[in-house]
Amino acid sequence: MADGSLTGGGLEAAAMAPERMGWAVEQELASLEKGLFQDEDSCSDCSYRDKPGSSLQSFMPEGKTFFPEIFQTNQLLFYERFRAYQDYILADCKASEVQEFTAEFLEKVLEPSGWRAVWHTNVFKVLVEITDVDFAALKAVVRLAEPYLCDSQVSTFTMECMKELLDLKEHRLPLQELWVVFDDSGVFDQTALAIEHVRFFYQNIWRSWDEEEEDEYDYFVRCVEPRLRLHYDILEDRVPSGLIVDYHNLLSQCEESYRKFLNLRSSLSNCNSDSEQENISMVEGLKLYSEMEQLKQKLKLIENPLLRYVFGYQKNSNIQAKGVRSSGQKITHVVSSTMMAGLLRSLLTDRLCQEPGEEEREIQFHSDPLSAINACFEGDTVIVCPGHYVVHGTFSIADSIELEGYGLPDDIVIEKRGKGDTFVDCTGADIKISGIKFVQHDAVEGILIVHRGKTTLENCVLQCETTGVTVRTSAEFLMKNSDLYGAKGAGIEIYPGSQCTLSDNGIHHCKEGILIKDFLDEHYDIPKISMVNNIIHNNEGYGVVLVKPTIFSDLQENAEDGTEENKALKIQTSGEPDVAERVDLEELIECATGKMELCARTDPSEQVEGNCEIVNELIAASTQKGQIKKKRLSELGITQADDNLMSQEMFVGIVGNQFKWNGKGSFGTFLF
């Protein structure tokens, strides 16, 4: 990323102050043969072709010293960087050829001498003149400019010290540390832009381990495009804040592991063969390598926009429950923007004084639902009166409370605005929500997450923005007579070890209807799923998707019907399912980047057979888990395993559901 200290905003302003660059315009192959950007038409956008001089903006570097203005090149749009890397710099090169291709690109567009730049590091800024360029090394040969201009955080950094430093570096500096001084003639526009692309690439795209990756297909498709998209998704607030933190932590861990791995490999090359120390180092090296591969796989899942939604991330909720009030009293909170006498009379009759003794119950009035939720203790009730309420924070519900609408859901609308995280965060032991319409805007996380405890949603409407409802491990979720739509990810995500009961709901117009996370790992419990009389329709992908690792696909093909595990898992249903589609990780990645389309499965009686298909696939997956556990116990010397331990009931029932007009069918499997 271009240094924010020089711009005051860095690339964070990219979406707000776009700058067009010369090579964003598509060039014909013939023009490339003449030399990239060597003629006026190829180095400036059509909006600048009739204007003399530079087509770029300039800005003054911050600091105590008055430096000359430099080119402002860090506010480029996604497609401008995309086209530059794809068409002109990297093309179809392999990871091992990146520096070579970059050097060839720079030879075509970079002025070899005659320009000035600000050499910028974390410690100082100094003005230099470029006398030559070592393209192969991506370095410039420089000398101090006259007059001498330097801005340093260290007062003792004198001109003599700077000369000594340059001598140590043989007057050769990395191009990415140079910021070209502005020249309104336009002669150095290409130079400034080319250096910006090199700088951005090595700061945001390149990883130190990339060269050691397999070169089966071009580096741009495999690494550059997904990382570039993720960078701009983060800039434009399309990625949850927690996931961004996870990504940067994974990067740091991977870099640290790779550094240790390189040091270990270097020490091994200097060891005597067959020594005890070498054997120990080799074991440690294998461990580091395995650790790195796992970290890199996690990074790839986050970098890919489709898999980012499919796998998500485990957000830890640190909400603390308040418990019961010290007085032991329970309070009813009434939410209304304005309280009319007639409304108050109806409330007293219908809700507040239904039982004897409720006349003594305390009532608090609020103008917005968020303040009411925040004021709740264990056992409180929140009654939301008809109206349209706009909130900007998260409903963090850690105590067992009831949140209910007084009227029809369409008359009681709670709308969340602002680029925050989750709309409703549930960690309470027994939370009940009913009769409310939740509307989400500009979100980067799901509309409702059940982290733990039990949450019941009844007679509600959920208008989603990103993912819909997420049911985490060990959580219980019950949804009845509700409508969920609009999720860009899955409408409902079900994690291993959770319980999910869905009855008489509509789930539609989402990316996927319901997504069941991988539960085949030995550390995971089988989820308990009940789906009765739901209508799952008009989703872009599948009605229901099961995510599981590729390594278990062979087991499924060889699984035998009628095993004890199958018998324990059977429910009241019949019918033979079609074979579920399987999509491996690479196909998913290609699909997400638009390189291929997943094949749609034809199922003429989809809404009838969909229930059977889901049941049979889940039974087969659960059977695999039982077989794997038996094998592991056998390896430990336990020859007679208790079948009851391995035949947990996955679901109470999957019956009466209708699957209509889902883009890829009623059921699919993601293999990763």
Curated annotation (Swiss-Prot):
Keywords: Acetylation, Cytoplasm, Cytoskeleton, Phosphoprotein, Repeat. Coiled coil: none annotated. The modification N-acetylalanine is found at residue 2. It is found in: Midbody; Cytoplasm, Cytoskeleton, Spindle. PbH1 repeats lie at residues 428-451, 452-473, 474-496, 497-518, 526-548. GO terms for cellular component: cytoplasm; midbody; spindle. The modification Phosphothreonine is found at residue 7. One of its GO terms (biological process) is fibroblast growth factor receptor signaling pathway. InterPro entries: Beta_helix, PbH1, Pectin_lyas_fold, Pectin_lyase_fold/virulence, SHCBP1-like. GO terms for molecular function: SH2 domain binding. The modification Phosphoserine is found at residues 5, 31, 42, 44, 47, 273, 634. Gene3D superfamilies: Single-stranded right-handed beta-helix, Pectin lyase-like. Its main location: other. May play a role in signaling pathways governing cellular proliferation, cell growth and differentiation. May be a component of a novel signaling pathway downstream of Shc. Acts as a positive regulator of FGF signaling in neural progenitor cells. PANTHER family: SHC SH2 DOMAIN-BINDING PROTEIN 1, SHC SH2-DOMAIN BINDING PROTEIN 1-RELATED. Interacts directly with isoform p52shc of SHC1 via its SH2 domain. Interacts with TRIM71; leading to enhanced SHCBP1 protein stability. Interacts with both members of the centralspindlin complex, KIF23 and RACGAP1. This is SHC SH2 domain-binding protein 1. It comes from Homo sapiens. The lineage of its organism: Eukaryota, Metazoa, Chordata, Craniata, Vertebrata.
